[in-house]
Amino acid sequence: MTHPAQPPVRLRLATALDGLAVAFGGMTAHPDEHNCECHWGSAEELAQLKVPDTELDPDLLRRTWQAPDWSDHASVLRRILPQFATALVKGSVEPLFGLEEAGRSFARGHWQQWPTVQAEAVRDFLHAWWADTLTDPDPAVPAYEVLALVTEASATLTPWLTTWETLTDHPADDHLAEAVAKWEYDLLGDQLPWDSWENEEETRTELTAWLVRNAPARLRAPGVSGELLHRVRLLGLTGDDRWEDPHWPGHRY
């Protein structure tokens, strides 16, 4: 597919979406795959997953990626990935709680263990979407939501923070301010700001340390409140030093 002139990160994302379509075109769920008609959907809907490349209606797509009990989640995920990824980028995926749920759907498929071409297509998409989000002044999905998804999908936070650290232009800093405002309550209570399947404490510790190191210099733009900077400073304190600081916001947990 050809694309009109676009910023490099947008072109990279378009190329990654095309790559998913190529890598997973023709894929279907396992012929013996099944699910509960009472709780998931009808036999006719299940049959759609066993036909390649036909578009699912949004509700069927949602029920498919959300279902935790497929016999072969990997084959189901491969069947829906091109459409699922496009819906994610457009912001049309609506989880019950947070977008980390969609990340866990990736994780349940163990995509990093797939054949190299398929795994690289997924990896390229996640990285391209993240870079595009950080450089877009008004992304369809907030950066803090995308970070939760890609972290859960990949079982690591490090590469995503590394990318954010290297992007120091205005949109990336604005997204950082928005994320800190969203996260500070949970992080000051020593809680990760999204539900995580594993390594929750390690992820929270890494995120907190990264914010303490990087956020202060990047949150001094006009419009960022001094109180938000104090919240970041408090993240670097522990115990009584944090709770008794004159700028402690009075959060109760």
Regions of interest found by a model, annotated:
Residues 1-11, 43, 137-158, 165, ...:
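Charge-centric, low-complexity intrinsically disordered segments used as regulatory activation/interaction regions
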Residues 1-27, 188-253:
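Terminal, non-catalytic domain-edge segments
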Residues 65-73, 77-208:
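Eukaryote-skewed repeat-based solenoidal scaffolds used as protein-protein interaction platforms
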